[in-house]
Regions:
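Alpha/beta-hydrolase active-site loop
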Residues: 127-148
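Catalytic histidine-centered segment of alpha/beta-hydrolase-like enzymes
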Residues: 275-288
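The serine-hydrolase catalytic nucleophile loop
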Residues: 88-102
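Hydrolase active-site cap/lid region
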Residues: 168-222
Length: 300
């Protein structure tokens, strides 16, 4: 009788474990779909970009014939362009507060803010995680050179996933006439940052959830979340300024060090001690001077 009771208890425990495991699996698959797919396209609302900077929309097609939207702040006879790439889940217009800083440092340059595939007003419903977005960045790169000439200078600025897209592309040597890169808050890999956010945002242990999420996304669209940007920057020969806020609330500071240390080419690392964003910098901030010197050196 005692053995039977113990057997029943054992089955109940196993049943509980099985239910918990099933729950983690189900939640992880739902989260994977939430990350992977855009379920509706946001309305394109007016912003300061049109009102203050007389911006205009431009569109191109990527290699999969998906239409991509960019917002261009034009200049007369431009010799250089700053391209701004946004983080995961945001859109080009969310980066409008960064425009004044590039206007200040490169007043003659036009500025192109890009909506990633499946973000903002770009078409598509499958997100690229900074991996499939590489080819789209190449399309924008080619568009600028085809439109303004092969000697047109380009500076790339990316925030979080935007930064990873740029660094990955630079390491693959698929970019042309890019004179400098500014990487803001880049992470080591999608796998690492998603696992970190699971624990920080949802209080869920990243294992086995992140493994389930990664398997589902790889099976669905052949994107490997373990693609590590540190692997790519070993081959990056474009001058790169890495900066990261010490108190970054989304990407932990520790993730920038493997990228900086592995980067082969000319590089600068700057950790913001107080501010969290580029547009919060004050006039006498040390980083503002570092940024100015970096831009002048490589965009001259």
């Amino acid at each position: 009788m005692v053995k039977n009771k113990n057997a029943v208890k054992g089955l109940l425990v196993l049943g509980g474990v099985g239910t918990a495991a099933f729950s983690v699996y189900t939640i992880s698959k739902k989260y994977a779909k939430k990350l992977l797919y855009r379920h509706h396209k946001q309305e394109d609302r007016p912003s300061i970009l049109e009102a203050k900077y007389s911006s205009k929309n431009i569109t191109i097609k990527n290699d999969q014939d998906i239409q991509l939207r960019g917002i261009l702040i034009p200049k007369e006879n431009p010799q250089e362009t700053v391209v701004i790439l946004h983080p995961f889940g945001l859109q080009a217009k969310d980066m409008q507060l960064y425009v004044p800083y590039f206007e200040e440092h490169l007043p003659e340059a036009q500025i192109l803010l890009v909506d990633a595939c499946a973000h903002g007003q770009s078409d598509g419903y499958i997100r690229g995680f900074g991996i499939k977005d590489i080819n789209d960045l190449v399309c924008w790169n080619n568009y600028l050179l085809d439109t303004y000439g092969k000697d047109h200078k380009i500076l790339l600025y990316g925030k979080e996933q935007g930064a990873n897209t740029i660094l990955n592309a630079a390491g693959k040597h698929v970019l042309k006439n890019v004179k400098a890169i500014i990487s803001d808050g880049a992470y080591t890999s999608p796998y690492d940052i998603i696992g970190y956010r699971l624990e920080a945002d949802y209080k869920i242990s990243k294992y086995p959830a992140i493994s389930i999420i990664a398997r589902h996304i790889k099976k669905a669209v052949h994107i490997d979340l373990k693609e590590n940007t540190a692997k790519y920057v070993r081959h990056n020969d474009i001058p790169t300024l890495y900066f990261h806020a010490k108190e970054d609330e989304f990407v932990p500071l520790k993730m920038v060090y493997p990228l900086y240390n592995k980067n082969r080419g000319k590089k600068v690392l700057f950790v913001l001690k107080d501010e969290k964003y580029l547009y919060e910098l004050v006039e006498n901030d040390d980083f503002k001077q570092t940024l100015s010197q970096f831009i002048k050196k490589y965009m001259k």
